[in-house]
Amino acid sequence: MPSIKVRENEPFDIALRRFRRTCDRAGVITDVRKKEFYEKPTWVNKRMKAAAVKRTHKEMAKNRVHRKRMY
Protein backbone atom coordinates (compact mmCIF):
# COMPACT_ATOMS: atom_id res chain seq x y z
CA MET A 1 0.00 0.00 0.00
CA PRO A 2 1.51 3.34 -1.01
CA SER A 3 1.94 5.93 1.67
CA ILE A 4 2.80 9.60 1.74
CA LYS A 5 3.96 11.94 4.45
CA VAL A 6 1.78 14.99 4.86
CA ARG A 7 3.95 18.06 4.83
CA GLU A 8 3.62 20.82 7.35
CA ASN A 9 0.86 23.32 6.44
CA GLU A 10 -0.15 21.21 3.44
CA PRO A 11 -3.85 21.32 2.56
CA PHE A 12 -5.74 18.06 2.77
CA ASP A 13 -6.80 18.26 -0.89
CA ILE A 14 -3.23 18.38 -2.13
CA ALA A 15 -2.16 15.51 0.12
CA LEU A 16 -5.10 13.44 -1.09
CA ARG A 17 -4.21 14.22 -4.71
CA ARG A 18 -0.60 13.10 -4.10
CA PHE A 19 -1.84 9.90 -2.47
CA ARG A 20 -4.14 9.13 -5.40
CA ARG A 21 -1.31 9.75 -7.84
CA THR A 22 0.99 7.35 -5.98
CA CYS A 23 -1.80 4.74 -5.94
CA ASP A 24 -2.26 5.13 -9.69
CA ARG A 25 1.46 4.76 -10.32
CA ALA A 26 1.61 1.66 -8.12
CA GLY A 27 -1.35 0.12 -9.95
CA VAL A 28 -3.44 -0.40 -6.82
CA ILE A 29 -6.78 0.56 -8.38
CA THR A 30 -6.38 -1.66 -11.44
CA ASP A 31 -5.30 -4.57 -9.25
CA VAL A 32 -8.30 -4.16 -6.94
CA ARG A 33 -10.71 -4.00 -9.89
CA LYS A 34 -9.11 -7.08 -11.40
CA LYS A 35 -9.47 -9.03 -8.16
CA GLU A 36 -12.95 -7.74 -7.31
CA PHE A 37 -14.63 -10.86 -8.70
CA TYR A 38 -13.29 -14.35 -9.20
CA GLU A 39 -12.46 -15.06 -12.81
CA LYS A 40 -12.15 -18.66 -13.91
CA PRO A 41 -8.86 -19.63 -15.55
CA THR A 42 -10.71 -20.46 -18.78
CA TRP A 43 -12.16 -16.94 -18.82
CA VAL A 44 -8.71 -15.49 -18.26
CA ASN A 45 -7.32 -17.50 -21.18
CA LYS A 46 -10.24 -16.49 -23.38
CA ARG A 47 -9.77 -12.81 -22.54
CA MET A 48 -6.02 -13.01 -23.20
CA LYS A 49 -6.55 -14.71 -26.56
CA ALA A 50 -9.14 -12.12 -27.57
CA ALA A 51 -6.72 -9.33 -26.64
CA ALA A 52 -3.98 -10.97 -28.70
CA VAL A 53 -6.28 -11.27 -31.72
CA LYS A 54 -7.33 -7.64 -31.36
CA ARG A 55 -3.69 -6.57 -31.08
CA THR A 56 -2.66 -8.48 -34.23
CA HIS A 57 -5.63 -7.11 -36.19
CA LYS A 58 -4.68 -3.61 -35.11
CA GLU A 59 -1.06 -4.10 -36.20
CA MET A 60 -2.15 -5.55 -39.54
CA ALA A 61 -4.50 -2.63 -40.16
CA LYS A 62 -1.72 -0.20 -39.29
CA ASN A 63 0.71 -1.82 -41.74
CA ARG A 64 -1.82 -2.30 -44.54
CA VAL A 65 -1.04 -0.38 -47.73
CA HIS A 66 -4.01 1.43 -49.20
CA ARG A 67 -3.92 1.23 -52.98
CA LYS A 68 -5.90 3.56 -55.18
CA ARG A 69 -7.71 2.25 -58.21
CA MET A 70 -6.58 3.71 -61.49
CA TYR A 71 -9.68 3.53 -63.66
Curated annotation (Swiss-Prot):
The keyword Cell inner membrane does not apply. The keyword Transport does not apply. GO terms for cellular component: ribonucleoprotein complex; ribosome. GO terms for molecular function: structural constituent of ribosome. GO terms for biological process: translation. Pfam families: Ribosomal_S21 (PF01165). This is Small ribosomal subunit protein bS21. Keywords: Ribonucleoprotein, Ribosomal protein. The lineage of its organism: Bacteria, Pseudomonadati, Pseudomonadota, Gammaproteobacteria, Candidatus Pseudothioglobaceae. Belongs to the bacterial ribosomal protein bS21 family.
